[in-house]
């Protein structure tokens, strides 16, 4: 049986496994950690989670380029978009925590992945880009938008840190 695995692995990956990064591999293994005993390991999945890590990195770069300590607000925003993202974040973190408590790491990673990629990056950050270009925006309103972006990113980093510690730590330190 072992020879069969070695032979098949050598045939499928003659030059070893492509380097996708430790965090992408960790995220993949967490996403595969279901109640089933069989794991269908696919390098396309690792590549997809590498893309997720890149998406998180690029989102953090955008936010860091927009922010300084001086332009962050101590007052939370009352805008519909900022309230919406906090509600969505609370739902995602609550659901993810519940899945982790039940040892369903596959479902926990799915919830976080979908929130970060589809809600935070694809919708909220894009909303904020448009809002921040508004010439009539007051300094306080701009500060509240940036604070909401940062606060949500920080919450995401804390939630993801046990799964992908290297990229989250690097982003956090910056």
Locate predicted features.
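Intrinsically disordered, low-complexity acidic Ser/Thr-rich regulatory segments
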Residues: 1-25
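Helix-rich, typically C-terminal accessory recognition domains appended to large enzymatic cores
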Residues: 16-174
């Amino acid at each position: 049986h072992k020879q069969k695995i070695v032979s098949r692995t050598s045939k499928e990956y003659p030059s070893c496994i492509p380097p996708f990064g430790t965090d992408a591999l960790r995220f993949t293994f967490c996403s595969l950690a279901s109640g089933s005993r069989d794991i269908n390991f696919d390098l396309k999945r690792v590549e997809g989670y590498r893309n997720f890590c890149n998406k998180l990195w690029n989102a953090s770069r955008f936010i860091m380029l927009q922010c300084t300590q001086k332009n962050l607000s101590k007052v939370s925003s009352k805008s519909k978009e900022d309230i919406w993202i906090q509600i969505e974040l609370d739902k995602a973190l609550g659901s993810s925590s519940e899945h982790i408590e039940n040892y369903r790491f596959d479902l926990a990673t799915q919830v976080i992945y979908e929130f970060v990629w589809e809600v935070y990056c694809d919708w909220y950050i894009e909303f904020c880009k448009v809002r921040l270009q508004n010439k009539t925006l007051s300094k306080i309103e701009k500060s509240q938008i940036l604070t909401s972006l940062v606060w949500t990113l920080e919450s995401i980093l804390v939630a993801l840190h046990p799964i992908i510690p290297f990229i989250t730590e690097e982003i956090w330190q910056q």
